[in-house]
């Protein structure tokens, strides 16, 4: 079970939002590269970056901070990025700059042809982020709710050749209410590609619950507010996950 620290970027700073609300941002660091180094030193084996400004305007906005993170840790662990990735040129540029994966969210829903082209051109590097509330997909930085069912879209994207699905339960994100295990497992069981859980991770019990369903196709979890607030010690959590994954 891969625990993936999230670094959410707004105006060049590392922040956390509550339920995707840009007006409810808590700044945790003004030096995102130092934050990336911190998580690698704590044992992180992958990092999850989100360009929050980019997600809202539809093009990259925190480029300096992202490049600084890649320069700091990109040679050591994979780094994935979502937010504002809406065209093939942007994907190519980020992969050339050293990202391992790009995450396509809104554009996958609104422009499936683009996602198909991205998978063809950059196979093995494309992850889709599906953000949902009550099983329905949301887009545009969570500001618009669609009528699409998560599972229907995810299976379509699997056919396109995406590497994995990151499934976020919007209602739980940043609220420390626990991962929506049932919905995550249900999605993972309906496809053969890995699902990465997101939204609501709060304590070691969540880690236990996730590891219990790892064999169902839940490969990892994005760690957000809990590891910044101190509710969850990242090193302890990854050690526990490793132990459980090894059947100990």
Swiss-Prot record:
Keywords assigned by UniProt, alphabetized: Amino-acid biosynthesis, Cytoplasm, Histidine biosynthesis, Isomerase
This protein's record includes keyword Zinc: no
SUPFAM superfamilies, alphabetized: Ribulose-phoshate binding barrel (SSF51366)
GO molecular function: 1-(5-phosphoribosyl)-5-[(5-phosphoribosylamino)methylideneamino]imidazole-4-carboxamide isomerase activity
Top class in the EC scheme: isomerase
Catalytic activity: 1-(5-phospho-beta-D-ribosyl)-5-[(5-phospho-beta-D-ribosylamino)methylideneamino]imidazole-4-carboxamide = 5-[(5-phospho-1-deoxy-D-ribulos-1-ylimino)methylamino]-1-(5-phospho-beta-D-ribosyl)imidazole-4-carboxamide
Pathway(s) it belongs to: Amino-acid biosynthesis; L-histidine biosynthesis; L-histidine from 5-phospho-alpha-D-ribose 1-diphosphate: step 4/9
Coiled coil: none
Disulfide partners: none
Family note: Belongs to the HisA/HisF family.
Name by which UniProt lists this protein: 1-(5-phosphoribosyl)-5-[(5-phosphoribosylamino)methylideneamino] imidazole-4-carboxamide isomerase
Species this chain originates from: Cupriavidus pinatubonensis (strain JMP 134 / LMG 1197)
Species lineage: Bacteria, Pseudomonadati, Pseudomonadota, Betaproteobacteria, Burkholderiales
